Swiss-Prot record:
It is found in: Cell membrane; Membrane, Caveola. This is Flotillin-like protein 2. May be palmitoylated. A lipid is attached at C35 (S-palmitoyl cysteine). One of its GO terms (cellular component) is plastid. It is a lipid-anchor. Gene3D superfamilies: Band 7 domain. Keywords: Cell membrane, Coiled coil, Lipoprotein, Membrane, Palmitate. Belongs to the band 7/mec-2 family. Flotillin subfamily.
């Protein structure tokens, strides 16, 4: 059965396949499991705690505590589900539990403090009560969301706080009279002090005005001298800049004159060099002309014979090249055929490897899905695979062949006669009942004949 909890609820599931308690907002609940729904919304608890101070003075502490499970802590929720969830949150059991914790901690804390300390340090007293109560509630997975501790109240027959209030009122009235008298005294003294201070401040201001006037005159003289000095420095700096610029200009003019003279000399020498080069080229051309004339006269016959020999050699070379190209073409075709055969073999092996990878990936996905289904229980996965692959049948077959000529122990059982319930629904229930009755003897027989224990989630064998 699939169950879903409300927004402020949790499912506490116990039973087969769960080690302790499983908390969830929604889950499948199997027949061998139990599910309890518990609410985690906080509840208000109102108390009037009677306590006694260190002076044995009783008092009443009205308080309203908003208490509920700690929803942000899984361990606390499991603790609450184990100890508190079987009881209704408004039940006397839970109410007495919370009230007992609050009263016990409040009384212990109040017994260590005087009434004066409790009354004057109310805020600290409330904080101490809150901290100590929270420490005790942690044992039950509960947390205090809000604690409203009201003003301390007298126990009937004891008027300590009433008298303490009257004392405070009288002290306030007396203090008010003292404050009025002190205010009048301070007013008269202050008036006289203000008059004296006025005269003192007037004389002080006159003296300071004269001093400031002299300081201003001195500062004006200093500023005038400073400005004149800066003007003189600026003039000297500009004169130096002009002298520097004139010097740089003279140096540049000298460099330009030098470059012009060097360029003129280089041009003259370049003309002379060019004339010499042209004369050399003319002489070379004359020598080449004479050489060509001699070649034409003496080497014409040798050239004809040379050309004839070259043509014959070229023809032989052409024939040999064609023969070599034919052999090379044949070798290339053989190499291409071998390459095509190797490519086909490689493609076949590659596809076979891809098939193995796809098979391994599918088997990995199958195993991960089975592990998720059994919540990462490897023993359950192993048993399922052995059943699904027929391992148990093969073991039984092997054992039967081994003991064929012996006298094995054969277990025969009968799960009783059929009891008709009626209809298709009755037939289905008979099959399920027969299956459950048949399962323990089968497991006993397997254990006796093979020594193999059934998985933990099926149950233990009867001894």
């Amino acid at each position: 059965m699939f169950k879903v909890a409300r927004a402020s609820q949790y499912l506490a599931i116990t039973g087969g396949g769960i080690e302790d308690i499983k908390l969830s907002k929604k889950s499948w609940v199997f027949p061998w499991q139990r599910c309890t729904v518990f609410d985690v919304s906080p509840v208000n608890y109102t108390f009037k705690v009677q306590a006694m101070s260190a002076e044995k003075l009783p008092f009443v502490l009205p308080a309203v505590f908003t208490i509920g499970p700690r929803v942000d802590d899984t361990e606390a929720l499991i603790l609450y589900a184990r100890l508190i969830s079987p009881h209704d949150k408004q039940s006397n059991h839970v109410n007495e539990l919370v009230e007992g914790v609050i009263e016990g901690e409040t009384r212990v804390l109040a017994a260590s403090m005087t009434m004066e300390e409790i009354f004057k340090g109310t805020k600290e007293f409330k904080k101490e009560v809150f901290d100590k109560v929270q420490l005790e509630l942690d044992q039950f997975g509960l947390v205090i969301y809000n604690a409203n501790v009201k003003q301390l109240v007298d126990v009937p027959g004891h008027e300590y706080f009433s008298y303490l209030g009257q004392k405070t009122q009288m002290e306030a009235a007396n203090q008010a009279r003292i404050d009025v008298a002190e205010a009048k005294m301070k007013g008269e003294i202050g008036a006289k002090e203000r008059t004296g201070l006025t005269l003192q401040n007037a004389a002080k201001i006159d003296a300071e005005s004269k001093i400031i006037s002299m300081q201003r005159q001195g500062e004006g003289t200093k500023a005038e001298i400073k400005v004149k000095t800066e003007v003189k420095v600026f003039e000297n700096q500009k004169e130096a800049d002009v002298a520097k610029a004139n010097s740089e200009l003279a140096m540049k003019k000298a460099a330009w004159t030098k470059d012009a003279k060097v360029a003129e000399v280089e041009a003259t020498k370049a003309v002379a060099l060019r004339e010499a080069e042209l004369q050399t080229q003319v002489e070379k051309m004359n020598a080449l002309t004479r050489t060509e004339k001699l070649k034409a006269e003496f080497l014409s016959k040798a050239s004809v014979e040379y050309e004839t020999k070259v043509q014959e050699a070229n023809w032989e070379l052409y024939n040999k090249q064609k023969q070599a190209e034919a052999v090379l073409y044949e070798k290339q075709k053989q190499a291409e055929a071998q390459k095509a055969e190797a490519d086909a073999t490689f493609y076949s092996k590659q596809k076979e490897a891809e098939g193995l990878v796809a098979l391994a990936s599918a088997q990995g996905t199958y195993l991960r899905t089975l592990l998720d289904a059994v919540q990462n229980d490897y023993s359950c996965l192993r048993d399922f695979l052995m059943i699904n692959n027929g391992t148990y049948q093969e073991i039984a077959k092997t054992n039967a062949l081994a003991v064929r000529d012996l006298q094995p122990k054969i277990s025969v059982w009968n799960h009783g006669g059929e009891q008709g319930i009626g209809g298709a629904s009755g037939s289905g229930m008979k099959d399920i009942a027969g299956l459950y009755k048949m399962l323990p003897p089968v497991l006993d027989t397997v254990y006796e004949q093979t020594g193999m224990q059934p998985p933990a989630w099926i149950g233990t064998l009867s001894k």
